[in-house]
Curated annotation (Swiss-Prot):
Catalytic activity, as annotated: (S)-dihydroorotate + H2O = N-carbamoyl-L-aspartate + H(+)
Enzyme Commission no: 3.5.2.3
Essential cofactor(s): Zn(2+)
Domain of life the protein comes from: Bacteria
Gene3D superfamilies linked: Metal-dependent hydrolases
Location of the active site: 246
Gene from which the chain derives: pyrC
NCBIfam families associated with the record: pyrC_dimer
Protein name: Dihydroorotase
Entry's family note: Belongs to the metallo-dependent hydrolases superfamily. DHOase family. Class II DHOase subfamily.
Pathway linked to the protein: Pyrimidine metabolism; UMP biosynthesis via de novo pathway; (S)-dihydroorotate from bicarbonate: step 3/3
Chain positions found as N6-carboxylysine: 98
A GO molecular-function descriptor: dihydroorotase activity
Binding positions for Zn(2+) 2 per the UniProt entry: 98, 135, 173
Length: 342
């Protein structure tokens, strides 16, 4: 197969940042994505409807390509009220609220310290039909970083699912076979996004032969048995699993340092990266559902009606890309890609 035409895909988890870098991140995400769920972990975080709508206007002001639509998210804190949830839902532009356990990832210090603090907000979300997006890791210092997702499933997520059975929730950027099993066996209100980099790489790619900081992300890359489970889930056709890049840019100097930031940039070639994974798994026929159908179906939104075409054509990823006044090193920098959007 040398060309594939699929319904225009969406990205159900992306970081665009803010300020002078927006022109670059919006350029890349809108190149062929129809919609994207925009992460709210700015400084300061997007904690209410007003700040979400303001952020949306800043994104649109960059002149995204095509008919790209940013779908906004508010950042849950210990103080998020039920009233704010209903206000956000009524705005027509806020599609979800994000649960960051405090300290779990980049700019999550204002996140939730205990689920007990957000029960009224979760109840309001269940009533309003708003999605809960979850960074599924515990943050206790005595829990090994490679085990934090598994422990979260057992100690935090399972009780939420039990206590709020009608709350639709997305376990984002899953990284373990445990998460695949949890989502598969949960009811129809639990879905998951899977990133391209967690499908393509495991912790050996990051650590063997030298530390490669551009593979460092959170949740951290796991061993290959978990990578294999993710590939099987993504290519299975199960509608619970869908595309979410978690493309998370940092300036080159903030990655290549003694204390580098977590995040991998993939928005420059997202669907091309996924296409390589699906081709290697002999599952190109499942790419459209994963990329273009399962996400909007889970969110109860219409599927896109136009298409994009990928061609089996080699092209080289730039070594660096513009990122405001800095540069970002994209995933597969300097390497050849196998598929190209034409």
């Amino acid at each position: 197969m040398t060309t594939i035409t699929i319904t225009r895909p969406d990205d159900w988890h992306v970081h665009l940042r803010d300020g002078d870098v927006l022109k670059d991140t919006v350029r890349d995400i809108s190149r062929y994505m129809g919609r994207a769920i925009i992460m709210p972990n700015l400084i300061p975080p997007v904690i209410d409807t007003e700040s979400a709508l303001s952020y949306r206007e800043r994104i649109i002001a960059q002149g995204p390509q095509g008919n790209f639509s940013p779908l906004m998210v508010i950042y849950l804190t210990d103080n998020t009220s039920a009233e704010e949830i209903h206000k956000a839902k009524a705005s027509g532009h806020v599609y979800a609220a994000k649960l960051y356990p405090a300290g779990a990832t980049t700019n999550s210090d204002s996140g939730v310290t205990s689920i007990d603090h957000i029960r009224p907000a979760l109840q309001a979300m269940q009533e309003a039909g708003m999605q809960l997006l979850i960074h599924g890791e515990v943050t206790a210092h005595d829990i090994d970083i490679f085990d934090r997702e598994k422990v979260f499933l057992e100690t935090v997520l399972a009780p939420i699912v039990e206590q709020f059975p009608n709350l639709r929730m997305v376990l984002e950027h899953i990284t373990t076979a445990d998460a695949v099993e949890f989502v598969t066996n949960a009811g129809p209100n639990v879905g998951a996004t899977i990133t391209a980099h967690h499908l393509m790489f495991n912790r050996n790619h990051m650590l063997v032969g030298g530390i490669r900081p551009h593979f460092y992300c959170l949740p951290i890359l796991k061993r290959n048995i978990h990578q294999d489970a993710l590939v099987k889930a993504a290519t299975s056709g199960n509608p619970k699993f869908f595309l979410g890049t978690d493309s998370a840019p940092h300036a080159q100097g903030r990655k290549e340092s003694a204390c580098g930031c977590a995040g991998s940039y993939t928005a420059h070639a997202a669907i091309e990266l996924y296409a390589e994974v699906f081709e290697a798994a002999d599952a190109l026929d499942k790419l459209e559902a994963f990329s273009s159908f399962n996400g909007p179906d889970f969110y109860n939104l219409p599927r896109n009606t136009d298409t994009i075409t990928l061609k089996k054509e080699s092209w080289n990823v730039p070594e660096t890309m513009a990122f405001g006044g800095d540069e970002v090193v994209p995933i597969r920098a300097g390497e050849a890609m196998l598929w190209k959007v034409i």
